[in-house]
Every structure is written in structure tokens, then in C-alpha cells.
């Protein structure tokens, strides 16, 4: 097995600093984007509800048209 390589404390500090800054940035960015994504999901759900309602109405009208033609 190869012995571990000695790494400068300055390089270690730089690596851990970059890691910490990346985690902090990611948390900040996530907290910034989370409300926007929730709003987009809410709007998409409302639009889907409206589309489903329109499709249901169209289907009922089509069935009513078929029933009236056949009778």
C-alpha cells in the first residue's frame, strides 16, 4: 500500500474553504429558488385543473351531441 502524500496546510485550508463556500452558496441558492419553484408548481396545478375541467366539459358536450343525434 502506498503511504499517504503530505499536503500543505495552506492547500488543505483552501480546499475546505472552497467546500464550505460551495455548501453555503448552495444553501443560499436553494432557499432563493424554493419559493419560486413552489409558486410555479402551484400555477401549473391550477392550469392543469382548468384544462381538465375544459376537457371534461368538451367530453360531456360531445356525449350530449352523440345522444341527441342518435335519438
Swiss-Prot record:
It is found in: Mitochondrion; Mitochondrion inner membrane. Subunit e, of the mitochondrial membrane ATP synthase complex (F(1)F(0) ATP synthase or Complex V) that produces ATP from ADP in the presence of a proton gradient across the membrane which is generated by electron transport complexes of the respiratory chain. ATP synthase complex consist of a soluble F(1) head domain - the catalytic core - and a membrane F(1) domain - the membrane proton channel. These two domains are linked by a central stalk rotating inside the F(1) region and a stationary peripheral stalk. This is ATP synthase F(0) complex subunit e, mitochondrial. One of its GO terms (molecular function) is proton-transporting ATP synthase activity, rotational mechanism. GO terms for cellular component: mitochondrial inner membrane; proton-transporting ATP synthase complex. Component of the ATP synthase complex composed at least of ATP5F1A/subunit alpha, ATP5F1B/subunit beta, ATP5MC1/subunit c (homooctomer), MT-ATP6/subunit a, MT-ATP8/subunit 8, ATP5ME/subunit e, ATP5MF/subunit f, ATP5MG/subunit g, ATP5MK/subunit k, ATP5MJ/subunit j, ATP5F1C/subunit gamma, ATP5F1D/subunit delta, ATP5F1E/subunit epsilon, ATP5PF/subunit F6, ATP5PB/subunit b, ATP5PD/subunit d, ATP5PO/subunit OSCP. The modification Phosphoserine is found at residue 68. Keywords: Acetylation, ATP synthesis, CF(0), Hydrogen ion transport, Ion transport, Membrane, Mitochondrion, Mitochondrion inner membrane, Phosphoprotein, Transport. InterPro entries: ATP_synth_F0_esu_mt. The keyword Amino-acid biosynthesis does not apply. It comes from Sus scrofa (Pig). Pfam families: ATP-synt_E. The modification N6-acetyllysine is found at residue 34. The keyword Mitochondrion applies. One of its GO terms (biological process) is proton motive force-driven mitochondrial ATP synthesis. Belongs to the ATPase e subunit family.
Amino acid at each position: 500500500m502506498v503511504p499517504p502524500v503530505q499536503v500543505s496546510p495552506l492547500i488543505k485550508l483552501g480546499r475546505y474553504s472552497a467546500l464550505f463556500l460551495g455548501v453555503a452558496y448552495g444553501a443560499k441558492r436553494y432557499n432563493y429558488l424554493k419559493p419560486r419553484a413552489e409558486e410555479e408548481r402551484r400555477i401549473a396545478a391550477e392550469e392543469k385543473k382548468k384544462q381538465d375541467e375544459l376537457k371534461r366539459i368538451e367530453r360531456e358536450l360531445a356525449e350530449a351531441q352523440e345522444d341527441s343525434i342518435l335519438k
